[in-house]
């Protein structure tokens, strides 16, 4: 009798083991990164199953059923990311991690409850830190259609301030470190969250309108990079039909580096290149696209340069604003290398938000800037 029971239990165990293995194999689903149900925001290049990008702040939303989500990916250097599960983007991510190798498997979520879930993954570092490629996603349930884009969208064009250089540092004497660069804590992200808007960033540290920081790489400035799909490569030219969105307003925050290291650019050259950038934006999105032009607090001359360039352009729907030196303090509001930290960026955002409200007609609500 005992022998029969043992044989029965052994057979039952084998059946259960085989059944569980079959179920496990059945529910492991691999989906290409280019699947249309996954929603990317920012400049990307789709190549077969792969999706690649390097600009700051590019993010995707992926909705799925089941407890598990993993990503097969590659990185050319060391990109850092913010991740949120089952919530909107906020100042504090659920998870922060770095990818620094090719053909890497990253578990984005596991142990989730039954039902539908959504993960948002945002690239928090800029193009100099690497190009990122998503190959595919692994789930134990179905990939579902992402929730859809927000009704509002803002595009920001800028330099290290827009990239989030040093935002997580609390000492202005700290050097640059990739792990303290976080575009999600910039004025751009704060303003976008305030209005409940999607956003994309076209930004690169050290870039100017006609002169980069300390004259680095003369003759190649932000008006040139703006035409590119990848920040760090001129190989692919970007066109607006490559994106499934059109911004409601474009914000340009450039000129700090033009006046860097106690130098002043020739105003005629500056105006010519600024107008070139304005015309590129208008060519992409139409003459009716409103553009908010922010003058840096680096020098009082920056506002005169930008205002004069806008007036010379002959273009409509341009607003120019000066951010003066008193917009934040130079102790607690600064992070690495004298760049605004999160606290400083909140103050910048609080000055920019009213102008965006006026330009777009979006009402300002009684809620904190965060």
Regions found by a protein language model. Name each.
Residues 41, 202-204, 294, 323-324:
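Conserved beta-strand termini and adjacent loop/short-helix elements that scaffold enzyme active sites
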Residues 224-369:
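Alpha-helical cap/lid subdomain in secreted, periplasmic
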Residues 57, 124-129, 167, 173-268, ...:
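Conserved SGNH/GDSL esterase-like catalytic core that processes O-acyl groups on lipids
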Residues 8-15:
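Bacterial N-terminal signal peptides
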Residues 2, 20-157, 161-180, 361-370:
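N-terminal secretory targeting modules
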Residues 1-7:
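Bacterial N-terminal signal peptides that target proteins for export
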Residues 156, 199-201, 320-322:
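Conserved beta-strand scaffold positions in the cores of enzyme catalytic domains, especially
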Residues 118, 155, 200, 290-292:
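A structural signal for isolated positions on well-ordered beta-strands in alpha/beta enzyme cores
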């Amino acid at each position: 009798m005992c022998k029969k029971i043992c044989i029965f239990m052994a057979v039952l165990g084998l059946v259960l083991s085989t059944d569980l293995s079959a179920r496990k194999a059945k529910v492991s689903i691999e989906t290409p990164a280019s699947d249309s149900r996954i929603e990317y925001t920012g400049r990307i290049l789709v190549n077969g199953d792969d999706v690649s990008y390097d600009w700051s702040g590019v993010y995707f939303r992926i909705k799925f059923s089941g407890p598990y989500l993993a990503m097969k990916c590659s990185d050319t250097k060391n990109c850092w990311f913010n991740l949120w599960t089952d919530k909107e983007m906020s100042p504090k991510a659920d998870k922060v991690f770095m990818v620094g190798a090719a053909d890497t498997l990253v578990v984005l979520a596991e142990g989730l409850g039954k039902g539908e879930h959504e993960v948002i993954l945002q690239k928090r570092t800029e193009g100099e830190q690497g190009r990122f490629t998503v190959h595919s996603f692994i789930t134990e349930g179905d990939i579902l259609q992402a929730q859809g884009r927000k009704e509002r969208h803002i595009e920001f064009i800028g330099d290290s301030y827009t990239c989030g250089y040093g935002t997580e540092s609390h000492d202005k004497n700290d050097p640059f470190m990739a792990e303290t660069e976080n575009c999600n804590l910039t004025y751009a992200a704060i303003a976008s969250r305030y209005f409940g808007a999607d956003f994309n960033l076209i930004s690169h540290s050290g870039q100017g309108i006609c002169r980069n920081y300390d004259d680095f790489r003369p003759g190649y400035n932000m008006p040139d990079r703006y035409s590119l799909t990848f920040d760090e490569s001129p190989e692919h030219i970007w066109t607006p039909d490559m994106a499934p969105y059109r911004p409601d307003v474009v914000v340009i925050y450039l000129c700090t580096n033009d006046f860097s290291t106690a130098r002043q650019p020739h105003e005629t050259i500056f105006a010519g290149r600024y107008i070139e950038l304005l015309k590129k934006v208008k060519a992409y999105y139409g003459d009716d696209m409103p553009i908010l032009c922010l003058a840096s607090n680096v020098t009082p001359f920056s506002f005169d340069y930008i205002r004069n360039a806008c007036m010379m352009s002959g273009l409509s729907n341009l607003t120019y604003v000066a951010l003066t030196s008193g917009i934040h303090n130079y102790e607690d509001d600064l992070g690495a290398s004298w760049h605004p930290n999160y606290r400083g960026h909140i103050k910048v955002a609080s000055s920019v938000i009213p102008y965006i409200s006026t330009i777009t007609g979006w009402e300002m609500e009684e809620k904190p800037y965060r």
